[in-house]
Amino acid sequence: NKENIRKIVSLRLEKANLLGFDCYANFVLDETMAKNANNVMSLLNNLWSYALPKAKAEATELQKLMDKEGKGEKLEAWDWWYYTEKLRKEKYNLSEEDTKPYFKLENVRDGAFAVANKLYGITLSKLEGIPTYHPDVEVFEVKDADGSQLGIFYVDYFPRPGKSGGAWMSNYREQHGTTRPLVCNVCSFTKPVGDTPSLLTMDEVETLFHEFGHALHGLLTKCEYKGTSGTNVVRDFVELPSQINEHWATEPEVLKMYAKHYQTGEVIPDEIIEKILQQKTFNQGFMTTELLAAAILDMNLHTMTDVKNLDMLAFEKEAVSYTHLRAH
């Protein structure tokens, strides 16, 4: 694939040059909030300076765990996830089986709705008898604080044959002028089985809040033209509303609103909340450096102004060396 990559990069550079840009990165970034490659690299390098020491400290902690085993082995890239999971269990002793009973799907969904009500004054009420494309789909009417309709929200939470996996937000009709939006969240949560309801993992809880953040972006928009409404925004802004909404999921005050044991109704204990919060920052130095290393490599590749003699192996080796990381 080395030659294919070189051709792709070459064609991208040629396209950028034809449109008056010195490199492909500046062409792509021209209509974003970042504006240009210099701003992006400044941000990435600044984040790197904070993330790398944290990742190194995490590596030291993992090495100590390996040393306890007495094998005399040095931590390698392929060891990271195995020993990270061992360390997680040792430090926090919190599993999905401890948290899932508190995360009944309907309670989590209603918790997300309650947060939206507190933040924006909106209400979501379930509608019955509305035609949908599948019996699993539920429909909610979204109203503003004054009772006026903002839009219709569909939820399609469960997997089925022929349905794609993953999670996303879609528009069936975008808001424009006085036309109200029809917005959908699609997910792949486990369906109820017998007397056991759909119980979510912590990751799935954050996914629900995240996708609902996208939905709110589409529902609360007020634009004259649908081409600028909702999620029709610059690429480096589109994830902001969803990321912000996702963070509400693990706020202690919010957790106590919706995280209740599906059998007893017990509110999630403070001890579990504390462990959830501690785990959110666990291994984040490594996770952040991995993301940054990939972004820096991509930026280095697409800020090149001459790729005629591009040697991908040499380029990648230099890029990895620059970030002081092993190739994971």
What is the predicted role of each segment?
Residues 1:
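Substrate/cofactor-recognition hotspot
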